[in-house]
């Protein structure tokens, strides 16, 4: 599946980063859509920061370097890293490449039974690769690609579809 960049309006919010110290305030273009997906091709790095959203990163072309807790992770193409809310991290891209960056406000799930358990599972980072989690990797990768496809559609059923796919992603 080819990932198409969404219209500038929906993706431009990421370029208007609001940083206070190391805290990045995520602003969403669409008020009732607490999910932001960006197909990032920019070579610029993101210095040490944290935000109240979960962040899912998947390099699509070339790798991506993420540093958390003084440990550096070199993500390969199609490996998935889930960074929990509040986790200080730094992002360093290669000189060329493409990566999917998905920011999710986990309060989306607060009214669901089992949210507390889900939130506690997401209190630390999770690296999903063919080696680390072979039993779920293919499904998780497929779900992220479906989320990207739904996000690019931007029709009246995109948001409910994305929510359903995120529920699957976080409960595997």
Label every model-predicted segment.
Residues 2-35, 88-152, 171-172:
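A hydrophobic/aromatic-rich effector-binding and dimerization subdomain
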Residues 33-123, 154-160:
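N-terminal regulatory/effector-sensing and dimerization cores
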Residues 151-167, 171:
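All-alpha amphipathic helical-bundle segments outside canonical DNA-binding/catalytic cores
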């Amino acid at each position: 599946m080819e990932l198409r960049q969404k219209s500038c309006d929906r993706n431009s919010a990421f370029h208007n980063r609001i940083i206070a110290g190391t805290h990045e305030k995520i602003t969403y273009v669409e008020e009732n859509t607490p999910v932001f997906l960006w197909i990032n091709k920019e070579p610029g790095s993101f210095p040490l920061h944290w935000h109240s959203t979960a962040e899912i990163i998947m390099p699509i072309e070339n790798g991506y370097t993420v540093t958390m807790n003084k440990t550096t992770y070199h993500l390969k193409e199609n490996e998935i890293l889930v960074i929990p809310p509040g986790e200080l991290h730094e992002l360093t891209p290669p000189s060329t490449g493409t990566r999917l960056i998905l920011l999710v406000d986990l309060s989306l799930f607060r009214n669901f039974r089992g949210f507390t358990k889900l939130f506690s599972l997401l209190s630390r980072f999770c690296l999903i690769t063919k080696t680390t989690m072979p039993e779920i990797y293919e499904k998780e990768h497929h779900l992220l690609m479906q989320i990207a496809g739904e996000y690019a559609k931007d029709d009246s059923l995109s948001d409910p579809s994305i929510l359903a796919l995120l529920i699957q992603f976080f409960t595997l």
